[in-house]
A protein has these predicted regions:
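Bacterial N-terminal signal peptides that target proteins for export
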Residues: 1-9
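Cleft-lining beta-strand/loop regions that shape enzyme active-site pockets
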Residues: 22-32, 36-53, 84, 107-111, ...
Length: 431
């Protein structure tokens, strides 16, 4: 690793070596614990119906954490297992992204390129009617994921229906090791590179580094060199703190990337940029929006405060807290908020977010104005926000057609990179 932590450590998904539960501090605490034990026993012995003691305890643990901030929670074994899969970027599956259509039916959002599903003719929008002979009606996404994923080499049987074809068809898919790509990239016009970071999982820094190298190679074949870079952090929910630091460090050669403060606002640690491994300098701009959260906000804040990249878009989500995952013996875990993080200039992100240097609103074509929920709006949960539908336009024949969406934020970032004197001045200072 080319970044250093003073005392920060791996604070998102690595267990820390301190006791999970402190010893009761007084007699009152002992009495409350005794009361809890008695209530549990009475329910087991006398409740009108048989109940699962394990489920009762799980519910009680969730109840304890529900009175704290929204990011402190108890994770039962199945949820914790899923979280580890999401951050590792590898799992046994069939290569489909799941979701719901407007009728709230389970559908395939997109099949993965070269995955088992696409090879069997599975298409975007296909309804998932049943899995291994069981109807998927009223299934949650979590239930569906658990059924679809499994050990490499095993099979899953799915009954599907194409979007515009009433005839159902069955596929038997053999599970393979699937890799979740957290980074996408492409070379835009005028030699400008584009890198999108979808989340911060294991090896995201390596993916960004590879993307940058490939953009350089592509640019050298056309205009000679990479003229600029757009880093897209929109709708990036965050992820691993150490990966956020590593990605920021790719573009920085000096300065504090992030610092954390715990209970009583005491400094816990800080991560500093290092010269070694820093990517070659090119003018750069970073796009953020209301969905840019947590680890993504660390990267955006560091690039902005240290003068490496201006931010373009709308204010970010505002999740400026750090969570630690503590493994429990039964395979479950406690996710607990242990600190707040601050940008290089000491700015708190919690409930505030990063403010863009260049404000450019998104023009998502929906009929109703949507107020995006940010961290400051959270209490016990985040309510689901549903779009009411796309606006429609009419062609010359009078028929309606979907409104074409222009990514005005990306387009503005391109124009800014091509014309702004800001980057010319920065380049002159580096000479």
């Amino acid at each position: 690793m080319k970044f250093t932590f003073s005392t920060l450590g791996y604070v998102l998904l690595m267990a820390m070596a301190f006791p999970v539960f402190a010893a009761p501090s007084n007699d009152e605490t002992y009495k409350k614990l005794e009361a809890f034990s008695k209530v549990l026993g009475y329910i087991e012995d006398h409740y009108i119906e048989k109940v699962s003691t394990t489920q009762l305890i799980d519910d009680a643990l969730r109840g304890i954490t529900s009175s704290l901030d929204p990011h402190t929670t108890y994770l039962p074994p199945d949820l914790y297992k899923q979280m580890k899969v999401d951050t590792s970027g590898e799992f046994g599956g069939v290569g489909i992204e799941l979701g719901y259509n407007q009728e709230k039916e389970l559908v395939v959002i997109a099949p993965t390129e070269d995955g088992p599903a696409i090879k069997q003719g599975v298409l975007p929008g296909d309804r998932i009617l049943s899995i291994d002979g069981k109807s998927t009606a009223n299934w949650s996404l979590m239930e569906t994921v658990k059924k679809v994923r499994g050990a490499r080499g095993t099979t899953v049987r799915m009954m599907l229906q194409h979007k515009d074809d009433p005839k159902a068809f069955e596929v038997i898919l053999k599970r393979e090791i699937m890799h979740i790509q957290s980074v996408e990239y492409k070379l835009l016009n005028d030699g400008i590179g584009y890198i999108q970071v979808k989340s911060f999982q294991e090896k995201t820094d390596q993916e960004v580094e590879r993307a940058f190298a490939k953009l350089q190679a592509q640019a050298s074949k056309s205009d000679g060199k990479l003229q600029g870079l757009i880093l897209d952090l929109r709708n990036d929910p965050g992820g691993l703190l150490d990966q956020a630091v590593a990605v920021a460090d790719l573009f920085l050669d000096d300065g504090v990337i992030v610092s954390t403060r715990g209970r009583d606002n005491l400094l816990q640690g800080e991560a500093k940029a290092q010269v070694q491994g820093t990517l070659p300098y090119v003018p750069m701009i970073t796009i953020i929006n209301e969905g840019t959260a947590s680890a993504a906000e660390i990267v955006a804040g560091a690039l902005q405060d240290l003068g490496r990249s201006p931010l373009l878009g709308t204010p970010s989500f505002g999740k400026g807290s750090v969570q630690n995952i503590i493994d429990l013996e039964d395979g479950s875990a406690l996710k607990i908020t242990i600190a707040r993080y601050f940008t290089p200039k000491g700015r708190p992100i919690q409930n505030v977010g990063n403010q863009p240097d260049i404000y450019v609103s998104s023009i998502t074509p929906v009929l109703d104005e949507i107020d995006m929920v940010r961290e400051k709006d959270l209490q016990g949960r985040i309510e689901t926000i549903e779009e009411s539908g796309l606006q429609k336009t009419k062609d010359k024949t009078g028929k309606t057609e979907p409104l074409k969406v222009v990514d005005i934020q990306l387009k503005t970032a391109q124009e800014y990179l091509k014309s702004s004197s800001f980057f010319q001045n920065k380049e002159a200072k580096r000479q």
